Curated annotation (Swiss-Prot):
This is Large ribosomal subunit protein bL28. GO terms for cellular component: cytosolic large ribosomal subunit. It comes from Wolbachia pipientis wMel. Keywords: Ribonucleoprotein, Ribosomal protein. The lineage of its organism: Bacteria, Pseudomonadati, Pseudomonadota, Alphaproteobacteria, Rickettsiales. NCBIfam families: L28. The keyword Ribosomal protein applies.
Length: 104
């Protein structure tokens, strides 16, 4: 398994390790990944992801998985997350149509 966040596609980054004498050597910064199960309230489904803690904090800040996906630009999401976002939008449109029909 590669060390990639399955929601945001974030990967390891590169930089320099700087010693006390200011010598610089190449190093990598790995993501802090966790296996989590996130629930979509709109779809009534559970999804399993390997997610970076930074992404988990953002999801917590936004409220839930649905709010995170709907408020995040599609370009920044992975393919798996984009598919879920499309399904969310379809369900929301369907609910709006049903509300409009029932009101009329």
């Amino acid at each position: 398994m590669s060390r990639v966040c399955e929601l945001t596609n974030r990967k390891k980054s590169f930089g320099n390790k700087v010693s006390h004498s200011n010598r610089k050597t190449k190093r990598t910064f790995l993501l802090n990944l966790h296996k989590v199960t996130l629930t979509s309230d709109i779809l009534n489904k559970k999804f399993r992801f390997r997610v970076a803690t930074r992404t988990l904090r953002t999801i917590d800040y936004k409220g839930d998985l649905d709010a995170f996906l709907l408020n995040t630009r599609t370009i920044k999401l992975s393919e798996k997350a984009q598919k879920i976002k499309r399904r969310l939008k379809k369900v929301l449109v369907k609910q709006e149509v049903e509300l409009a029909v029932s009101d009329a």
